[in-house]
Swiss-Prot record:
Species assigned in the record: Dictyostelium discoideum
Lineage: Eukaryota, Amoebozoa, Evosea, Eumycetozoa, Dictyostelia
InterPro entries: CBS_dom, CBS_dom_sf, Diverse_CBS-Domain
PANTHER family membership: CBS DOMAIN-CONTAINING PROTEIN, CBS DOMAIN-CONTAINING PROTEIN CBSX3, MITOCHONDRIAL
Name of the protein this chain belongs to: CBS domain-containing protein DDB_G0289609
Keywords: CBS domain, Repeat
Listed Gene3D superfamilies: CBS-domain (3.10.580.10)
Pfam families linked: CBS
Superkingdom of origin organism: Eukaryota
Domain annotation CBS: ranges: 9-66, 84-141
């Protein structure tokens, strides 16, 4: 069974701009119940990725105040571009899913931005997507009566 990334990826994509402040990124992650946001320029080109972990590390700094509102205020002072991972690991939409799994395992990332043949961002594939596929493949099929 050969499954391609394009068959598994999420096409409803949330992205964030380079100039967005960290507080807005945090709110976007929380509001959409997601763990990573591709960072794009004004033309929609992928420039980086920011994760909930990146933001947790930024907000858990001993240099920030204890009060959450004060922490958010400090995050308003910094742009996504200041902490994003540049040149994130990506995969093409026509790649086999097994390649995505290997790439995630080797690079220790929880999700990959998916690019088309022209290098445009068109989706995301995550560990959860891979686990859902694994469950579907391994789950016994009930006998037909």
């Amino acid at each position: 069974m050969k499954v391609l990334v394009k068959q598994l990826m999420s096409k409803s994509l949330f992205t964030i701009n380079l100039d967005t402040t960290l507080d807005v990124a945090l709110k976007s992650l929380n509001a959409n119940s997601i763990h990573r946001l591709p960072v794009v320029d004004n033309d929609g080109n992928l420039k980086g990725i920011i994760t909930d972990r990146d933001l947790r590390l930024a907000t858990d700094s001993p240099f920030l105040p204890e009060n959450n509102e004060d922490r958010l205020e400090k995050l308003r002072l910094h742009k996504v571009s200041s902490i994003m991972k540049q040149n994130p690991v990506t995969i093409e939409d026509f790649s086999p899913v097994v390649e995505a799994a290997k790439l995630m395992r080797v690079t220790n990332v929880g999700g990959l931005p998916v690019l088309d043949k022209k290098g445009r961002l068109i989706g995301m594939v995550t560990r959860s997507d891979l686990l859902d596929l694994l469950i579907k493949v391994l789950e016994p099929v009930p006998p037909q009566s």
